[in-house]
Amino acid sequence: MDLTEFNEIRPYNDEELPQIFEELIADPAFQKAATGAIPNVPFELLAQKMRACKTKLDFQEAFCYGILWKIAADHTAGLTLDHTAIPDKSKAYTYISNHRDIILDSGFLSILLIDQGMDTVEIAIGDNLLIYPWIKKLVRVNKSFIVQRALTMRQMLESSARMSRYMHYTISEKNQSIWIAQREGRAKDSNDRTQDSVLKMLAMGGEGDLIDRLMEMNIAPLAISYEYDPCDFLKAQEFQLKRDIEGYKKTTCLLYTSPSPRDS
């Protein structure tokens, strides 16, 4: 297998991190985002902490783990994970889950896996979300691999086949678990049905017949349940706009900085 075919989509290798960290640290847009997310820590200290990370897991434990547990502490009554159906912690799994929030779904899963003595997951993320170069770099530091969108039909087939080969390689050879949503985009109406195209994509890689290829992925269906949908008011707003404006299409990203009423 020629692993270089995955270079465009895979997470960074650990030996690539020092250069990527320096590129991020030198990026004014990343500096602004980092100081906004962690306002009480000087950026120089954040940069020093980044440079001390030797692996992607080091980075996740240094930054993501604490931030996600703080979100959980501040905005939830607690997180739980029932992992009893797949007790073998040494195996890699493909967690296919319903989808509510691209950061929290996979992030909460990863920190709960860490607390059970397991590795974090690699995350399938669409390139439509990677609107700035620093975001694309950061998610690949955070063990994400890229799902390419907005392609021609032929390009989409080629991209799907490559991603399937990468996922089979990740599970079988790297022994690294994966998180992927069961459908493209969030289920805004809570209709959590797995898209046929997701299963077809998984079966494009590997060897043997259809069942063999899917079995090779060690699929673990995952149901994520939030008392309140993390993006509920944004989804309601979009539904209303689609109802009231003929031909409405979501084309802009609205950022809200005021706290949610339920957090006050």
Model feature map: region roles:
Residues R162-E207, E216:
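Loop-centered beta-sheet repeat module
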